[in-house]
């Protein structure tokens, strides 16, 4: 699952000061000095992995695809720039959770789901994260679409009321912002990449099989995924 590490700090690593050029620094003095933040982050992560139907489905799908996820190996609670909540580090196959910016369990659940979608894409496809912005755009579209980032409830908390086609608008906007945060490219280039892949990637609902607009939707999707797995196992 690991990729060649980037040689320059051009890929958003400035937002995650504990890693620097794709190298995890889990045991840094900074992490240890902020034990309370780290402990809370680890606890919320465990709850997310154990109880979120979004996360449980993604973990099962990755295991089925040959990419078993281990909490201690593939997740890292770290201090980050104030503008981000998490990230997927393709160079180390790690999900970074920003312990200083995630304070509620519902937020942790969404971040874990969002980043697990990137990890799932990394597992199932030959994603060229560092050189192909269209690949990055596709995964950002899928993550925004399927993670719950753009549910109506979350949009209302952002004071976005009654926008026609709000879900698609939100997905496009969040994908664009995510790309611009981690790539030193123009807005025009990012918009072009999003536009080119939007339809196909927005309609790629794997492994959920649908857009889970709520926790209840995610539970149904998880049940269907388990039943599908049992069906194929009995063939």
UniProtKB/Swiss-Prot annotation:
Q: What is this protein called?
A: Mitochondrial inner membrane protease ATP23 homolog
Domain of life assignment = Eukaryota
EC number annotated for this UniProt entry = 3.4.24.-
Its keywords, alphabetically, are: Hydrolase, Metal-binding, Metalloprotease, Protease
Per the record, the GO terms for biological process are:
mitochondrial protein processing; mitochondrial proton-transporting ATP synthase complex assembly
Tell me what gene encodes this. atp23
- Family membership, please give it: Belongs to the peptidase M76 family.
Chain sites annotated for binding a divalent metal cation: 114, 118
Which Gene Ontology terms cover its molecular function?
Answer: metal ion binding; metalloendopeptidase activity
EC top class, as a word: hydrolase
Q: Which organism is it from?
A: Xenopus laevis
**One of the record's GO cellular component terms:** mitochondrion
Q: Where is the active site?
A: 115
Q: Which InterPro entries match?
A: Peptidase_M76_ATP23 (IPR019165)
């Amino acid at each position: 699952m690991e990729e060649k590490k980037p040689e320059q700090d051009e890929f958003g690593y400035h937002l995650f000061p504990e890693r620097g050029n794709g190298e995890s620094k889990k045991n840094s003095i900074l992490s240890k000095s902020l034990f309370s933040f780290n402990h809370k982050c680890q606890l919320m992560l465990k709850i997310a992995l154990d109880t979120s139907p979004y996360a449980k489905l993604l973990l099962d799908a990755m295991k089925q695809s040959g990419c078993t996820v281990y909490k201690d190996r593939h997740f890292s609670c770290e201090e980050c720039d104030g503008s981000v909540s998490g990230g997927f580090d393709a160079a180390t196959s790690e999900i970074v959770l920003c312990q200083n910016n995630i304070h509620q369990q519902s937020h942790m659940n969404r971040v874990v789901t969002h980043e697990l979608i990137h990890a799932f894409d990394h597992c199932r496809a030959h994603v060229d994260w560092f050189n192909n912005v269209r690949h990055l755009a596709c995964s950002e579209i899928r993550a925004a679409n399927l993670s719950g980032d753009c549910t109506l409830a979350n949009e209302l908390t952002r004071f976005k009321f009654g926008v026609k086609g709000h879900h698609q608008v939100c997905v496009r906007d969040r994908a664009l912002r995510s790309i611009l945060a981690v790539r030193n490219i123009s807005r025009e280039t990012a918009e072009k990449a999003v536009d080119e892949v939007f339809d196909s990637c927005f309609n790629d609902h794997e492994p959920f099989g649908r857009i889970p607009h709520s926790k209840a939707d995610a539970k149904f999707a998880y049940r269907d995924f388990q039943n599908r797995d049992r069906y194929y196992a009995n063939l």
